[in-house]
């Protein structure tokens, strides 16, 4: 698990692959532990506290902020209707991450803040994941779409030759966002 996480962290060209494989490995470990009745620690939610800058261009940070904002809004709607595993805490964490990312970007805040949830409300339990074509819990698809958007933004940032306003992370804190690690 940590090898894939390290690949994502230290090899920009393999960020997407490392991130997804790390998540898959963590999921496999959880499934195996559950089947073997092994108690493993629950993942901790991470935050953006203490992060002063990121080595990602302005446009990518703004795109990541928009993805976090959109899933935060959807989770808020789902929590209000008691759908899936959505909670107001999850919604708040996404929205806080969104705000932090847009602040770090220095870009004009063009987030919509409210989004069309008609399709989500029509399919509150399961929905087709457009990336895989498979039915999955709607809240899980929302999280995966957010993660895919962020991975694409970072991948675009790492391959962009004219990336604007890049700076190094100045925090010693390893927190990166509001989703489970």
Stretches found by the model and what they are:
Residues 1-181:
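All-alpha RGS (Regulator of G-protein Signaling) helical domain and cognate RGS-like helical scaffolds
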């Amino acid at each position: 698990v940590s090898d894939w996480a390290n690949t994502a962290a230290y090899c920009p060209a393999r960020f997407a692959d490392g991130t997804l494989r790390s998540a898959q490995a963590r999921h496999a470990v959880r499934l195996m532990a559950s089947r073997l009745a092994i108690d493993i620690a629950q993942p901790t939610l991470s935050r953006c506290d203490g992060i002063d800058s990121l080595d990602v261009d302005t446009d990518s940070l703004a795109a990541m902020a928009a993805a976090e904002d959109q899933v935060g809004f959807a989770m808020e709607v789902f929590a209000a209707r008691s759908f899936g595993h959505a909670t107001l805490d999850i919604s708040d964490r996404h929205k806080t991450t969104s705000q932090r990312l847009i602040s770090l970007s220095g870009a004009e805040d063009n987030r919509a803040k409210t989004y069309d949830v008609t399709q989500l409300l029509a399919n509150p339990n399961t929905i087709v994941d457009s990336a895989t074509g498979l039915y999955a819990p709607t809240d899980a698809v929302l999280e995966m779409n957010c993660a895919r958007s962020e991975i694409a933004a970072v991948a675009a940032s790492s391959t962009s030759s004219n990336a604007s306003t890049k700076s190094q992370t100045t925090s010693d804190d390893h927190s990166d966002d509001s989703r489970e690690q």
